[in-house]
Structures are given as C-alpha cells and as structure tokens.
Amino acid sequence: MPRQLSAAAALFASLAVILHDGSQMRAKAFPETRDYSQPTAAATVQDIKKPVQQPAKQAPHQTLAARFMDGHITFQTAATVKIPTTTPATTKNTATTSPITYTLVTTQATPNNSHTAPPVTEVTVGPSLAPYSLPPTITPPAHTTGTSSSTVSHTTGNTTQPSNQTTLPATLSIALHKSTTGQKPVQPTHAPGTTAAAHNTTRTAAPASTVPGPTLAPQPSSVKTGIYQVLNGSRLCIKAEMGIQLIVQDKESVFSPRRYFNIDPNATQASGNCGTRKSNLLLNFQGGFVNLTFTKDEESYYISEVGAYLTVSDPETIYQGIKHAVVMFQTAVGHSFKCVSEQSLQLSAHLQVKTTDVQLQAFDFEDDHFGNVDECSSDYTIVLPVIGAIVVGLCLMGMGVYKIRLRCQSSGYQRI
C-alpha cells in the first residue's frame, strides 16, 4: 500500500510538471492571441538572416517594391507572406538541430536590352530558434509570382524577355499560403529605340524618256521597198514585197496641204497570224503600225481590211483609220499578185495609205518562192497607152514616108 501511494504521488507530480511546462510553452508560443485574428508575418532578405525575436504584431509589413533610380529599375526583394496561426499548437515544439536552408531566387531586369541572362540573387538563411519560425513541414509550391507590377522591355528580334518575377524554387522548404497584396498584371512596354521603325520609303519613278515621233515631209519622195514575211511554224504563210507611204491631212478639204511619211523597212517589224481562211500582216514601226488582213475564198484570195495608226510629235497629233469590206489585190489561190503602179486607199478623212512596187502572196505556198504572177489592171492601163502611142507614131511615120515617096515619083516625069 505505501508503494502504491508513492507511485501515485510520483505520477501526480510528473503530471503537474508536464502541465506546468505546457502552460509555459503556450505562453511563450502565443503571448498575445488577440492580435492573431489577421496576422501578417513579412520578412525581407535582411530580416530572415537573423532569428526573429520580436512579437508578431510588431513584424514590419513589407512587399516587393520597385524603385527607379537614375533611369534604372532596381528591386528590393521582399517576400510577403501570411501565416495562418489562429489554431494554437498542441504539440510540443522542439528546436531543430539541423540548419534549415531557405533559398530565395530573384531575377532583376537589366537596364539595357541585351541577350545576357539576368543575374540571380541567392540568399541562404540560417536556422531560427525563435518560437515564431515557419514550420518546415509544409511542402513549397513550384513558384510564386511577385506581387509588384513589373515592366518588361521588348526588343526586336528573337530575344528572351527579362521578367521581374520573384521565383521560389522547389528547394525552399516553406510554403507561402496566401499573399497579403493582390497580384498586378504585368504590363509590357516597348523600350524607346528598340522597336522597328517603319520606313516610309517613297520611290520616285524615273521619268520615261520620250521618243520623238515620226516627222512628216511636205513633199512626196521615193519609197523604199521592204520584204515582210509571216511564218506558220516553219512554213511560209504571208510574203510581201512593197513600199508603203502614209499621207495625212489636217483638214477635210481638197485644198488642205498634204504631208507624207515613208515607212522605213529597216525600222519595221513584221508579225501576224496565219489561218486557213483568214490571215493578217502587222507592220510595227516607231510611232504607228499598218495592218493588212487577207481573206481566202474558194478560188481566190484578196486583202479585205486595211488599218493604220500614226502619231506625230510636232505638233502632237494622232492619225488613224481603218477600211473594212474591201477587195484589194485579188488573185487566184497559189498565185502571187504584182502591181508596180501606185495604189491609194482612203482610211479616214485625215489618213490615206499608198503602196508601190507591190508583189505579195498569202496561203498555199510552194517552197519560199512566189507563185505565178497576176498583175494588176492599173499596170495594163499604163502599158496600153504607151503601146498605142507607139503604134500611132509608127503609122504617122509610115504615112509620111509614103507621101514623100509619092512626091518624088511625081516630080520625075514631065508632060510631052
């Protein structure tokens, strides 16, 4: 019985000691519970380096602040945290013997736009034996974003954007449960001088060199004969040998003076189209063109359309005209047409075309030579008067000789 009483007394004594120690520990851990309704424990890097000995209500409230000094952005790194401590601890806290390493990694924006990585500030905080130390049993988040607004400088090109974010890596053994300040959105701004300038390039077109147009002659002159050909693949389609002259008049009057322009074969380019029933010959020269259209019937072909265009520079005047549904230089299929005499065609009231020394053929060529020649009727009209004049002259000469002879015979006889 005395042993049981002594054991009970020892038990009560130990319980009293335990309760006494627990009350002292709670008094030390939570000196003023009335101020813990909304506790805010914030510590800068400088405050974390040494143990916290002050009560929670006197803890300074600090945030991540940015200061502008001499045009550069400098950051005073601060981690603002809120530690819920409304629930009193019922367990016995023992001082940690191994040091707890808190690594706070911050990045600072460099003042210039460079491609180098931002400097990293790493702070190692020693162990704290204060009763208000953060519990090391909470797993940290991957990272938290800084609460202060940061300015991101955009540079042209593919460059990394330096962000003014406070990143807490996984090596940090504490968790920031709630931030005391709301996060502000990051507003990127373009740094002056880094954006690509828009160049308003004004291209001034070089003035085109004006080529002087054809000049007109007041009097007609001899026309050069040119040879113009149009090929259908490797076969000859149109072949023309002729001289062309354009005659212009400024007024629709017979008494209006005429001016003349001769087409130079050396400065003329021939082109055209070939068909089974219709082909055309286009002659391009400086200041204008002449177009001839050939039409083929069952047994003959002819020029069915003639058009011309001429631009004169001094004074600047345009003369143009076209004649449809004409029958000009008609001849048999497979033959060539020849006309030495001048042929004129009125295309408009101010433009007239004249050809001379013409020999041409379209369709049905044998080799590259002209076929049988069919001459124009105007050439015959020139020859016949000449032949008639020659015949009349010969007749007159014969009659004169006969008359003279009669006189001689009559003068040789006398009457007896």
Curated annotation (Swiss-Prot):
Gene3D superfamilies: 2.40.160.110. Glycans are attached at N112, N158, N164, N200, N232, N266, N291. Detected in tonsil interdigitating dendritic cells, in spleen, lymph node, Peyer's patches in the small instestine, in thymus medulla and in B-cells (at protein level). Expressed in lymphoid organs and dendritic cells. Expressed in lung. Up-regulated in carcinomas of the esophagus, colon, rectum, ureter, stomach, breast, fallopian tube, thyroid and parotid tissues. Residues 1-27 form the signal peptide. InterPro entries: Lamp2-like_luminal, Lysosome-assoc_membr_glycop. Residues 403-416 are cytoplasmic. This is Lysosome-associated membrane glycoprotein 3. It comes from Homo sapiens.
